[in-house]
């Protein structure tokens, strides 16, 4: 569990624990750079950060020793592990909790790993949310909360609304995040432009979002330049995760690829169009029924994980026309005239 989207997919575990143990204080250990996506969750008491992958060896050791000292002092009754990483198992060994649960990973059969926990739970489910929830089996819980949660403060939406007003965006807008961490998860820029044109011709304003990197911003710029009418790009690279959650929550539709914003859209119950390529589209799909998902494997055979070319856009086989048809299904009515006039 390394990335922002992964963190959202753990929230049903947090909610289920809080639902069954309402007086419990729930702390979470995660990578430092993923903290913002859960920073507004009211069910979490405290967030503790593990050094990111790029940190130096000395900084990592210092971070782990500091975490051990802090977490030991918290005197936990229960520790739940949702990752197969050795560092976490060794850290758990240092905590005096009465009950320590991990999932039973087939590739983690070493005695040191097994003895780091008091219980090893069999893994169940075809989706990561179901698999995460299966770790609670040793607790005998029967009442599960299965929705993901993306929390944000009211001030986040107030800020986004002010920004949207300044950009001339009305109520019926669509958020599109075309970028992902790796190119093999991305779709063609010109196809995004075609989808945007189709939406804007029906009166919907399109807000493009992305991360702050130069590559992400260049992608958004190229897509915008390929459109007949330029979409809204003023928020690209400028939203924190809670603000992005607020922005997507108030959108009429979200369109994206295999990345965290799709999971945010699912969590806030905004309709989703999601495009997947050479990744597990069942296991990692946004956890919602209000979704139209495109998998490149339905158009062309996808490579196995070991054959994957990370510099290839596998999503290119998905036609823009199919995605446009999906927008018409999820948004069967044109935007109200007030929104259409805002684009003039």
Curated annotation (Swiss-Prot):
The protein's enzyme class: transferase
Cellular component, GO, one term: cytosol
Catalytic reactions on record: an L-alpha-D-Hep-(1->3)-4-O-phospho-L-alpha-D-Hep-(1->5)-[alpha-Kdo-(2->4)]-alpha-Kdo-(2->6)-lipid A + ADP-L-glycero-beta-D-manno-heptose = an L-alpha-D-Hep-(1->7)-L-alpha-D-Hep-(1->3)-4-O-phospho-L-alpha-D-Hep-(1->5)-[alpha-Kdo-(2->4)]-alpha-Kdo-(2->6)-lipid A + ADP + H(+); L-alpha-D-Hep-(1->3)-4-O-phospho-L-alpha-D-Hep-(1->5)-[alpha-Kdo-(2->4)]-alpha-Kdo-(2->6)-lipid A (E. coli) + ADP-L-glycero-beta-D-manno-heptose = L-alpha-D-Hep-(1->7)-L-alpha-D-Hep-(1->3)-4-O-phospho-L-alpha-D-Hep-(1->5)-[alpha-Kdo-(2->4)]-alpha-Kdo-(2->6)-lipid A (E. coli) + ADP + H(+)
Family annotation (CDD domains): GT9_LPS_heptosyltransferase
Pathway, per record: Bacterial outer membrane biogenesis; LPS core biosynthesis
Superkingdom, taxonomy of origin: Bacteria
Record InterPro entries: Glyco_trans_9, LipoPS_heptosylTferase-III, LPS_LOS_Heptosyltrfase
UniProtKB keywords: Glycosyltransferase, Lipopolysaccharide biosynthesis, Transferase
NCBIfam families in the cross-refs: heptsyl_trn_III, PRK10422.1
Identification of the protein by name: Lipopolysaccharide heptosyltransferase 3
Organism this protein belongs to: Escherichia coli (strain K12)
Organism classification: Bacteria, Pseudomonadati, Pseudomonadota, Gammaproteobacteria, Enterobacterales
């Amino acid at each position: 569990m390394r990335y922002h989207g992964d963190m959202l997919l753990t929230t049903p575990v947090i909610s289920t624990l809080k639902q069954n143990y309402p007086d419990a204080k729930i702390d979470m250990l995660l990578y430092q750079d993923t903290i913002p996506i859960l920073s507004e969750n009211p069910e979490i008491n405290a967030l503790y950060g593990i050094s990111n992958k790029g940190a130096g060896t000395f900084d990592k050791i210092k971070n782990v020793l500091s975490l051990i000292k802090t977490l030991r002092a918290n005197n936990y009754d229960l520790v739940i592990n949702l990752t197969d990483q050795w560092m976490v198992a060794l850290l758990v060994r240092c905590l005096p909790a009465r009950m320590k649960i991990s999932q039973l990973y087939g590739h983690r059969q070493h005695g040191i790993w097994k003895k780091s926990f008091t219980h090893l739970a069999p893994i169940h489910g075809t989706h990561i949310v179901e698999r995460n929830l299966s770790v609670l089996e040793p607790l005998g819980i029967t009442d599960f909360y299965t929705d993901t949660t993306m929390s944000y403060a009211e001030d986040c939406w107030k800020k986004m609304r002010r920004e949207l007003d300044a950009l001339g965006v009305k109520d019926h807008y669509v958020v599109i995040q075309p970028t992902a961490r790796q190119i093999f998860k991305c779709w063609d820029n010109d196809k995004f432009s075609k989808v945007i044109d189709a939406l804007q011709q029906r009166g919907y304003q399109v807000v493009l979002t992305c991360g702050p990197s130069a590559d992400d911003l260049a992608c958004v710029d190229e897509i915008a330049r390929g459109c007949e009418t330029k979409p809204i790009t003023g928020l690209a690279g400028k939203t924190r995760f809670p603000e992005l959650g607020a922005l997507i929550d108030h959108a009429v539709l979200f369109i994206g690829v295999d990345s965290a914003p799709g999971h945010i859209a699912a969590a806030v119950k905004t309709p989703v169009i999601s495009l997947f390529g050479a990744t597990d589209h069942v296991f990692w799909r946004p956890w919602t029924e209000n979704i139209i998902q495109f998998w490149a494997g339905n158009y062309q055979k996808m490579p196995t994980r070991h054959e994957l070319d990370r510099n290839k856009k596998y999503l290119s086989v998905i036609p823009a026309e199919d995605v446009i048809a999906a927008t018409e299904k999820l948004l069967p009515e044109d935007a109200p005239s007030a929104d259409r006039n805002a684009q003039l």
